[in-house]
């Protein structure tokens, strides 16, 4: 497929405000592609070259990209930088430069062979792999070779892609729907396969080649989508929901981790499926010493501890390990321990279809507990009073609360169901709990906030519809530093219209592709005719909103937009808050 054909679809997707139109455009594109192009097309649409755990990054900043455009188009770098400064869009700067360029002979577009999708993809992969001395010059040379042959519109999307600002906002669930339509594969079967093997490019090529989804199996080295929990605010409700009995375990304030063991090596993946092994060399060493298995996939929570007292530290202390050059120092200052709570795969056996109690038994058989690695403290209860005693014990030890699980539940990858329920200490707040919401819009600030965004439009994610529904407009809780950070973080996701996956009655000054997740709390959840979350779920014609919302200061970089709070959770929180909410 010619790259220009892909670019036409990308432009159409970018301009639509309808999700159904987006799916139709992508379906048509996939139908026209050869099987050996489908994976590359899917990666390009998602703005990636490989799945997140492979860690393939282009390493191209705006300045380097503009230097490559300058080299290809013969436009002075200063002119390109001026356009970029005015528009904030490196793609637009590239488009204008190549539109005005005088490229003689073979470099005149229309006279050379058009770019192919595979050709562009392979070149960008070379850009990502360029390393060591001379890597920057190599990246510029490779990119310039693409820009020299690209049409202005093609250059626009190549430039945006390489700096990580494609801004399409196409999610995996949207692509799964398009794949289902394009290749006649059942959507539910496709979703199940995706939960086991969340590599959209590889999965797309698999179905495009007509291969059966039964071949897709859980495999060490490939992270699965984690099972997620609902939330309730009383032990009696939790036990009733779980059929009278629950496995209750400490909810640690740390980083959820998938531990993959294979061939003597250990890899650690985050809940967003990113390879974070480099950040936890001490945990890798401890796992090798504590787990007696040739191949395994385990789940647990990595928690920072005080090196002097052994007391657990807040989740934020693990952020010191995110900077590669600071890991060695962080290991000394903020040592980590691993609390394991599940085993999904063990020496050739897929355990996800086995009941929780059996998985816990198998976990205890292979884990030799040490100071660094232990099994999360848990107990089986059928009495609400005993659950509450255990809950208060957990909170007094610095835990967030409990996670209560059905003893007979299987491991449902990618699902947020009622087999796992969070029971958290935030219950003392009128709103009962914090929520994780997605920034979909912003309002310009005034006074001392002038030049920045003063408030943000936030939304919940509904996995049933793959859409985002607004919950609140929040401007409280942000420090001056927070506002500056939010402005910088959100700029790559700024778009000229409401995103097709966002449902909103409010019109902010600026719209964003749903990407950034932040934690919010408020006075209460109230009925509101202004917001679209849970519209009609509690009362006809009104949705649910957060009254007096406040940013907690926590950026949920560990969560994808599709892992944000759901409308179903908002309804549960509304029902369980101490104060009965009235319409705004």
From Swiss-Prot:
Residues annotated as the enzyme's active site: 251 (n6-amp-lysine intermediate)
Amino acids binding ATP: 249, 256, 271, 301, 341, 416, 422
Record keywords: ATP-binding, Cell cycle, Cell division, DNA damage, DNA recombination, DNA repair, DNA replication, Ligase, Magnesium, Metal-binding, Nucleotide-binding
Cofactor(s) listed: Mg(2+)
Known catalytic reactions: ATP + (deoxyribonucleotide)n-3'-hydroxyl + 5'-phospho-(deoxyribonucleotide)m = (deoxyribonucleotide)n+m + AMP + diphosphate
Annotated EC: 6.5.1.1
Function: DNA ligase that seals nicks in double-stranded DNA during DNA replication, DNA recombination and DNA repair.
The protein, known as: DNA ligase
